[in-house]
Amino acid sequence: MKGTFLICLILIAGFYFRSIQGFYFKRIQGNICSEPKKVGRCRGSFPRFYFDSETGKCTPFIYGGCGGNGNNFETLHACRAICRA
């Protein structure tokens, strides 16, 4: 029981630190929150979020899967965390 708990705790910590590292990397790339929404040039259908600088809110959109820019977040939480919405 303790072993299972420890393994779960290690996995959760690993995912957490990996996501923090990703957030930090996006921040140092420049002000991605002011970039326009870009759906990309491919025909995929991936639900994503972008920061709309006119409304000051994270807004859902459908990403095509390639191209695009940094203002493209997999979750609403990630968009809000990076762009402080």
Swiss-Prot record:
PROSITE patterns per record: BPTI_KUNITZ_1, BPTI_KUNITZ_2
Signal peptide (residue range): 1-22
Site (Reactive bond for trypsin): R43, G44
Subcellular location: Secreted; Nematocyst
GO molecular function, one term: ion channel regulator activity
Propeptide: 23-29
BPTI/Kunitz inhibitor domain segment(s): 33-83
Temperature dependence: Thermostable. Complete trypsin inhibition at all temperature ranges (25-100 degrees Celsius).
Entry keyword Secreted: yes
InterPro entries assigned: Kunitz_BPTI, Kunitz_BPTI_sf, Prtase_inh_Kunz-CS, TFPI/VKTCI-like
Sorted UniProt keywords: Cleavage on pair of basic residues, Disulfide bond, Ion channel impairing toxin, Nematocyst, Protease inhibitor, Secreted, Serine protease inhibitor, Signal, Toxin
S-S bridge residues: C33-C83, C42-C66, C58-C79
Residues at the site labelled Important for the stabilization when complexed with trypsin: E74
GO cellular component, as recorded: extracellular space; nematocyst
Other comments on record: Negative results: does not show activity on all potassium channel tested (Kv1.1/KCNA1, Kv1.2/KCNA2, Kv1.3/KCNA3, Kv1.4/KCNA4, Kv1.5/KCNA5, Kv1.6/KCNA8, Shaker IR, and Kv11.1/KCNH2/ERG1).
Family of the protein in this entry: Belongs to the venom Kunitz-type family. Sea anemone type 2 potassium channel toxin subfamily.
Function per UniProt: Serine protease inhibitor that also shows protective effect in a cytotoxicity model. It binds to all proteases tested (trypsin (Ki=52 nM), alpha-chymotrypsin, cathepsin G, kallikrein, and human neutrophil elastase). It significantly increases neuroblastoma cell viability in an in vitro neurotoxicity model, being a consequence of an effective decrease of reactive oxygen species (ROS) level in the cells. It also seems to protect cells by inhibiting ATP-induced purinoceptor (P2RX7) activation.
The protein, known as: PI-stichotoxin-Hcr2i
